[in-house]
């Protein structure tokens, strides 16, 4: 079934920067997980797939529900959890982000929960694998804990060519070192590392890494309160949209409503940049919006927006 429009109010919530989202809650081997509704295109009963030779061990194969061939990923295998004994009732969660479609094989779908990003906490690195962890947040909802998985990291591991490529910066040719400081807000450990690496290679050696919108906002407030010209602290902000504690839309709203901070160019760099999301970002004041993994285009936009800073 497609995600009902009446159920998917994420667009309404994000339009005003209310810092809320809706997640689809699902289970794998009785463990509870979540994914942002905005990433999900359809939920359907699991069906037969065509195995692909020499594919990643968590790839079950491909199927063609309509006019598109979609790769199916076993979340049980990826997470090291047992397969369901009664697989006839399993579910495919069909996603679309980063301009790519994948189906994630799960065991049950519980429902759709509306939740505030403030209720989603950063996972403990010691428990969830540090730099290699598969979780971006832990949500508490109605007395139960839901693990928000880093689906972008999962896809990047299975299909590295679909993720951010450092080679894209090398193709831009020789570049000079810039003194300007770039503030990055990104909750995925893997993507944050890749973005910073690419910015450094592009000549932006001064970067500030934050794991979510709240950390970025706290830094901006400190910079503002210092009394120094704000451009001495931050020349440009690059922010994801999906982040625990405070999302990128809420961060954009706060920055662009502040008389001092609104002068800082802000780029939304997210896997969720659809036409609908682009309208919302523009309404909230984002200077530019670009879909992952177009890192070369991101660097070009930073160049353009910081020309006079």
How should these model regions be labeled?
Residues 1-237, 241-249, 262, 271-309:
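An acidic, low-aromatic, low-complexity terminal/linker signal
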């Amino acid at each position: 079934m497609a995600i009902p429009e009446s159920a998917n109010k994420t667009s309404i919530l994000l339009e005003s920067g209310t810092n809320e989202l809706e997640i689809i809650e699902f289970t794998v081997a009785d463990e509870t997980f979540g994914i942002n509704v905005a990433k999900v295109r359809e939920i359907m009963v699991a069906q037969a797939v065509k195995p692909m030779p020499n594919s990643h061990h968590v790839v079950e194969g491909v199927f063609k529900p309509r006019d598109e061939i979609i790769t199916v990923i076993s979340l049980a295998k990826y997470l090291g959890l047992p397969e369901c004994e009664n697989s006839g009732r399993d579910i495919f969660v069909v996603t679309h982000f980063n301009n790519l479609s994948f189906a994630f094989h799960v065991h049950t779908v519980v429902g759709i929960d509306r939740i505030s990003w403030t209720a989603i906490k950063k996972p403990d690195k010691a428990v969830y694998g540090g730099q290699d962890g598969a979780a971006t947040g832990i949500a508490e909802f109605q007395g139960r804990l839901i693990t928000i998985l880093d689906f972008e990291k999962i896809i990047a591991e299975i299909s590295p060519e679909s993720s951010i490529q450092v080679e894209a910066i090398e193709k831009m040719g020789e570049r000079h070192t810039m003194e300007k400081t770039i503030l990055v807000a990104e909750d995925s450990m893997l993507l944050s590392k890749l973005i910073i690496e690419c910015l450094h290679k592009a000549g932006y050696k001064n970067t500030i890494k934050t794991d979510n919108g709240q950390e970025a906002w706290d830094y901006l407030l400190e910079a503002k309160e210092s009394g120094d010209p704000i451009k001495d602290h931050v020349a440009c902000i690059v922010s994801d949209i999906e982040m625990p504690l405070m999302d990128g839309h809420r961060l954009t709203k706060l920055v662009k409503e502040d008389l001092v901070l609104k002068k800082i160019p802000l780029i939304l760099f997210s896997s969720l940049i659809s036409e609908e999301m682009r309208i919302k970002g523009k309404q909230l004041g984002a200077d530019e919006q670009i879909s992952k993994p177009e890192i070369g285009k991101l660097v070009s936009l930073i160049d353009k927006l910081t020309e006079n800073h």
